[in-house]
C-alpha cells in the first residue's frame, strides 16, 4: 500500500489491520471490530453507515459500513460486494484498505455516524471466529501514542 499522500501512521495502521482482513464477517462486523480496537487504543474516528455507489457502473450498496479517520476512509469489505454484484473485473477498481475517498469513482454518501456498542473482548473474538484477538493491541496503542494522530483525526 505505497501512497506518498498517506500519513505513515495510517500505513502502519493498515499493516496492523491486515491481521483481521480475512475475518469471516461482513462490513458491519468488520467495522465493529476495527472501531472497537481504535476506541481501545484511543484513536479518534467515526464508524459510518450509508450508501456507496458508482454512477458509471450503476453499482449501489445500502446499507454499507465504513470507518473515517479525518479525511481518510477505511473499508475492507466494499470490494467483496462489488465482486458479488458486478463481477471480479469491476471489483479490482473498488477501493480497499485505507484511502482518501475524495475523487474516486465510488462515492460514499448519506453516511450517518453509527458508534459501535461497547462489546466485551471475548464476545468480539467469538463473533469474529477468533480474529479479534489477532489484532496487536500493544502495537496499536503504541502507534496511537507515538504520533500526533489529532492531525489526521479531525473527523468531518
Question: Residue ranges of each PLM-predicted region?
Answer:
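A structural boundary/capping signal
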Residues: 1-156
Amino acid at each position: 500500500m505505497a501512497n506518498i499522500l498517506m500519513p505513515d501512521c495510517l500505513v502502519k495502521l493498515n499493516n496492523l489491520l491486515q491481521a483481521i482482513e480475512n475475518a469471516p464477517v461482513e462490513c458491519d462486523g468488520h467495522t465493529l471490530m476495527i472501531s472497537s480496537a481504535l476506541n481501545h487504543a484511543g484513536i479518534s474516528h467515526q464508524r459510518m453507515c450509508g450508501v456507496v455507489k458508482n454512477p458509471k457502473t450503476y453499482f449501489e450498496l445500502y446499507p454499507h459500513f465504513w470507518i473515517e479517520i479525518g479525511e481518510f476512509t477505511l473499508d475492507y469489505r466494499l470490494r467483496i460486494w462489488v465482486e458479488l454484484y458486478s463481477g471480479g473485473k469491476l471489483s479490482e477498481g473498488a477501493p480497499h484498505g485505507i484511502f482518501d475517498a475524495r475523487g474516486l469513482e465510488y462515492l460514499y454518501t448519506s453516511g450517518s455516524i453509527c458508534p459501535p456498542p461497547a462489546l466485551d473482548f471475548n464476545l468480539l473474538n467469538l463473533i469474529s471466529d477468533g480474529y479479534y484477538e489477532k489484532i496487536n493491541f500493544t502495537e496499536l496503542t503504541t502507534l496511537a501514542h507515538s504520533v500526533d494522530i489529532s492531525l489526521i483525526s479531525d473527523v468531518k
